[in-house]
């Protein structure tokens, strides 16, 4: 042993060796981390040679191999499997939502082989294999290819080319594929090449793949089980929109990347196959077990985006007809076809096609149209070119559908999907941020189509009930989104799915309608013809549409606009919300301001550009006036001043074609109230609707006093239009009011006030129900509004309503073939249970067990919650938790029961001992929803604390953090409702 050092520190040999080993290990670890840095999660193709991921530079691969990491598990349909936060990869184009512009797809040769066999569909999944050859044109030199792929296993990948320019497109060579890996979070397949693709050259990507088909998932490929002719059967279908094609085959899954498709489907011989185009031929092939399969090939499609690729494999029958040389077939269950359920849809489909062909002066380009009715289809309907897919409840007429709105619903949806053959299929938006260009216009033309075939159809009133009322109730600045969004605002694929909402469809349709109203229909259609012709088989952006409108406007002199079409319409599509237009009839002063919930006063919350260029169509004393424009925050229009005469009044927003609310000064509202009481018919129905809807919405949000809205209801004894009554009742007798009304003296006053006015319209329709209910089948507005009228009359205790409910319910329970009239069935079932015993409740339970349609089962689910017997409701909750006989996918029974006055206390008591079972059955989010429902009556901080303590053990930590804020919001809303209800009660005392 040597002497110690006089300075520093001493390290023994053993420690030195240990430190050296640790240092070496650290260096090795750093080297491995450096090598692995940037690696994305990969799925190893079975027959591909793999080596490490190169740097991000777009250059050919070297020959040096690197050690491979452990392969991660293959993706599943579980959300957690699609993200790769734990896997490293270098930054690159796979981090972007949009594909890089390196390749342009020209043509797909697609073969799909789902292993669907008769009587072999007990599993929740089945497998499929496929091959796709994609001809692409190289637009930028690259040694790396990106295309979309999700939940697919790549079996092989080759790149051939460049292709010769001859007629046979022969390959001049092959480009080595060194590696294939997947960026799961952005849903990309990445091919690393051994050579660089050259700009201007064409190549063919040859990919083999496999995946799973899920039962009832309704995304990509899915299969469904149904009953037909007494037997359980299966079918397979597709839903590619918006981004599910990539889960069926690797592809360039963006709407602007259109291509032609040759599709081949391999299927069991007992099934038939459908796709976008007519069948070209059939052959046979054997699988490895020697089983024979049918190979069906289809003709080449026009240029179209991947989201329109469609297929179905089924054992269905069909009915057909020919319209202008085009074959139209409707496919459905054999029972449904034999019973004639598809006849109505078949009879109107051809004429709708012909009408739109003539309107746009562009022929439908496909030789056939197949429409298939699936037993269930969550998307309602899909417009795939040549193969439209529907939920059968929205396409097929049942014998008991005569006194329903089913004919109108089928007509609306068929018109919408057929409208897409031009808006969306022929001309496609460049990207999903402008999805309203297809959905908004398809929704708008629903009404034009139906109005053409039924001139008595009340287009304005129906547009209000179906479109405008709903979207104006939900749209407001600060919270709602704009119709057209910036592409750069999107970062995740899931955000695309969120665009299929009220603003895309309803607001888009409303803006199209407003545009048509201030241009006139001829100019509107001329511009659309030009737009559709120019961009046929191509893509367009919103600015392209405005450009064609401007061209048509510039070529005429009758219509003068205060600004270019783009300047006018961009305000409406790029800004969220809508304006409130206020007119002072004494001075003619008009102003606009954004509509905010609760009329936000904090100006710092407002956007810098919070005005619109507003078209004002208006009437004075019943006479239509010239269009004026409000293109600034305020302006004076002397022509809108009114005199002191009782006969002088003004209404803005003719036919409710403008997308805004209208307010008046006190004199203006008083003039309209006086006119309603003197001669309501002098004001058109659509404007009686408008005044009621605007006044109540404005009062709810503090723009006018509630008394102003209530004053407009005094005349209602003279109102015989049920759609106006509908507007009154949905605004006045709200769910919150019904839920809380027993806490106030309002109910007896409201009962007396409304029944005095409602009795006339009630007598009219109750007589029809008793004596000639079939007369309602062509009265769409009555079918829409009757349920609310009936529900309110019974809630107010109108004895004739209660008696009619008892009669209809008893007649049905004694003879189930005597159907309760559909428009009021939910109300009759509810009151039948409410005034019945366990015998009536058990009857509904038995009916529920024998029903197969989800719509009918949900209706019965709600009705059974109407019982007023605590023990029955408690038993109902036990059934709900044990799931027998209730299926998991249906309505959350706990929440339904909690909605009733009796039920909310039963649910609260039930949760004390059963919250774990409720959480397992419905999820912890349901507990949050239940807390909000039960909390509808809270009005103090102490009640909030008590409710939080009650639910404290049931909620997850992250939910507890947000719950108190939500309960505080509910409390504030309840306090506002109390103030509002107190003022309503005071007004009713004076006017009853």
From Swiss-Prot:
Residues 2-13 are cytoplasmic. GO terms for biological process: peptide catabolic process; proteolysis. Substrate binds at residues 241, 380-384. PROSITE patterns: ZINC_PROTEASE (PS00142). Expressed in skin. Expression levels do not differ between dark and light skin areas. The keyword 4Fe-4S does not apply. GO terms for cellular component: cytoplasm; extracellular space; membrane. Pfam families: ERAP1_C, Peptidase_M1, Peptidase_M1_N. The active site is at 417 (proton acceptor), 505 (proton donor). The keyword Hydrolase applies. The chain crosses the membrane at residues 14-34. Binds 1 zinc ion per subunit. One of its GO terms (molecular function) is zinc ion binding. Glycans are attached at residues 133, 262, 289, 347, 361, 555, 584, 602, 609, 655, 811, 850, 889. Metalloprotease which may be important for placentation by regulating biological activity of key peptides at the embryo-maternal interface. Involved in coat pigmentation patterns. During skin development, may be required to establish the periodicity of tabby markings, initiating a pre-pattern at or before hair follicle development. PANTHER family: AMINOPEPTIDASE Q (PTHR11533:SF31), PROTEASE M1 ZINC METALLOPROTEASE (PTHR11533). Belongs to the peptidase M1 family. This is Aminopeptidase Q. It comes from Felis catus (Cat).
């Amino acid at each position: 042993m040597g002497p110690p050092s006089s300075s520093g520190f001493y390290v023994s040999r053993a420690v030195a060796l240990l430190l050296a080993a640790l240092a070496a290990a650290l260096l090795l670890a750093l080297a491995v981390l450096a090598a692995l840095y940037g690696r994305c999660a990969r799925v190893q193709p079975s027959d591909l040679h793999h080596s490490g991921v190169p740097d991000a530079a777009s250059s050919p691969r070297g020959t040096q191999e690197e050690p491979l990491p452990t392969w991660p598990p293959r993706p599943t349909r579980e959300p957690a499997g699609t993200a790769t936060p734990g896997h490293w990869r270098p930054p690159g184009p796979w981090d972007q939502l949009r594909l890089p512009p390196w390749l342009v797809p020209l043509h797909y040769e697609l073969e799909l082989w789902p292993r669907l066999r008769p009587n072999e569909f007990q599993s929740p999944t089945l497998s499929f294999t496929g091959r796709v050859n994609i001809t692409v044109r190289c637009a930028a030199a690259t040694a790396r290819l990106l295309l979309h792929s999700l939940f697919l296993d790549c079996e092989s990948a080759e790149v051939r080319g460049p292709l010769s320019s001859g007629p046979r497109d022969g390959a001049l060579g092959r480009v080595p594929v060194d590696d294939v890996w997947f960026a799961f979070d952005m849903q990309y397949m990445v091919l690393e090449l051994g050579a660089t693709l050259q700009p201007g050259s064409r190549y063919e990507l040859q990919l083999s793949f496999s995946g799973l088909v899920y039962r009832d998932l309704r995304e990509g490929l899915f299969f469904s089980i149904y009953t037909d002719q007494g037997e359980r059967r299966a079918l397979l279908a597709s839903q590619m929109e918006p981004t599910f094609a990539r889960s069926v085959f690797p592809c360039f899954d963006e709407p602007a990347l259109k291509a032609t498709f040759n599709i081949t489907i391999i299927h069991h011989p007992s099934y038939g196959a459908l796709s976008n185009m007519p069948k070209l031929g059939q052959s046979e092939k054997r699988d490895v077990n020697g089983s024979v399969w049918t190979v069906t090939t289809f003709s080449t499609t026009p240029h179209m985006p991947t989201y329109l690729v469609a297929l179905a494999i089924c054992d269905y029958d069909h009915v057909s007809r020919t319209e202008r040389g085009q074959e139209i077939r409707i496919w459905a269950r054999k029972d449904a076809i034999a019973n004639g359920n598809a006849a109505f849809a078949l009879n109107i489909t051809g004429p709708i096609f012909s009408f739109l062909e003539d309107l746009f002066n562009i022929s439908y380009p496909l030789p056939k149209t197949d429409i298939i009715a699936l037993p269930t289809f969550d998307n309602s309907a899909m417009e795939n070119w040549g193969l439209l897919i529907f939920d059968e409840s929205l396409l097929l007429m049942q014998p008991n559908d005569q006194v329903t709105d089913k004919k109108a619903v089928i007509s609306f949806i068929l018109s919408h999907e057929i409208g897409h053959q031009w808006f969306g299929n022929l001309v496609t938006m460049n990207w999903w941020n402008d999805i309203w260009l297809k959905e908004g216009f398809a929704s708008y033309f629903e009404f034009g189509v139906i109005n053409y075939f039924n001139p008595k159809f009340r287009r304005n009133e129906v547009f209000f009930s179906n479109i405008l009322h709903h979207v104006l109730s939900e749209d407001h600045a600060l919270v709602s989104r704009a119709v057209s969004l910036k592409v750069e605002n999107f970062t995740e694929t899931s955000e695309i799915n969120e665009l299929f909402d009220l603003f895309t469809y309803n607001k888009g349709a409303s803006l199209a309608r407003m545009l048509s109203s201030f241009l006139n229909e001829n100019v509107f259609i001329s511009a659309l013809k030009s737009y559709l012709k120019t961009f046929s088989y191509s893509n367009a952006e919103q600015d392209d549409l405005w450009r064609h409108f401007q061209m048509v406007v510039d070529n005429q002199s009758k219509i003068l606009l205060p600004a270019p079409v783009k300047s006018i319409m961009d305000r409406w599509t790029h800004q969220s919300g809508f304006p409130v237009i206020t007119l002072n009839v004494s001075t003619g002063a008009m102003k606009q301001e954004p509509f905010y919930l609760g009329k936000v006063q904090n100006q710092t919350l407002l956007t810098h550009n919070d005005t619109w260029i507003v078209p004002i169509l208006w009437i004075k004393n019943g006479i239509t006036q010239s269009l004026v424009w409000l293109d600034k925050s305020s302006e004076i229009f002397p022509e809108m001043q009114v005199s002191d005469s009782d006969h002088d009044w003004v209404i803005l927003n003719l036919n409710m074609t403008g997308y805004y609310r209208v307010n008046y000064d006190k004199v203006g509202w008083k003039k309209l109230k006086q006119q309603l009481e003197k001669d309501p018919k002098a004001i058109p129905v659509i404007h009686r609707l408008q005044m009621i809807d605007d006044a109540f919405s404005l009062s709810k949000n503090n723009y006018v006093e509630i008394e102003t809205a209530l004053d407009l209801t005094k005349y209602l004894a003279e109102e015989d239009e049920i759609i106006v009554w509908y507007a009154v009742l949905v605004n006045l007798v709200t769910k919150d009011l019904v839920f809380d009304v027993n806490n106030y003296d309002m109910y007896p006053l409201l009962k007396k006030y409304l029944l005095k006015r409602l009795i006339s319209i009630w007598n009219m329709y109750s007589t029809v129900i008793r004596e000639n209910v079939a007369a309602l089948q062509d009265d769409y507005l009555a079918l829409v509004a009757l349920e609310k009228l009936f529900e309110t009359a019974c809630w107010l205790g109108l004895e004739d309503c209660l008696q009619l409910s008892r009669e209809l319910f008893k007649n049905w329970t004694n003879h189930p073939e005597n159907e309760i009239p559909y428009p009021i069935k939910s109300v009759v079932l509810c009151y039948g249970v409410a005034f019945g015993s366990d015998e009536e409740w058990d009857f509904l339970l038995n009916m529920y067990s024998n029903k197969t349609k989800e719509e009918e089962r949900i209706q019965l689910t709600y009705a059974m919650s109407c019982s007023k017997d605590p023990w029955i409701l408690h038993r109902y909750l036990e059934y709900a938790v044990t799931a027998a006989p209730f299926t998991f996918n249906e309505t959350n029974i706990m929440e339904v029961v909690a909605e009733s006055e009796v039920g909310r206390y039963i649910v609260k008591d039930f949760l004390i001992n059963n919250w774990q079972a409720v959480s397992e059955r419905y999820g912890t989010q349901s507990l949050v929803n239940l807390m909000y429902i039960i909390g509808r009556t809270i009005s103090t901080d102490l009640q909030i604390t008590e409710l939080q303590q009650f639910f404290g053990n049931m909620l997850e930590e992250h939910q507890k953090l947000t719950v108190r804020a939500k309960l505080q919001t509910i409390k504030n809303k309840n306090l506002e409702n109390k103030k509002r209800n107190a003022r309503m009660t005071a007004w009713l005392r004076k006017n009853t």
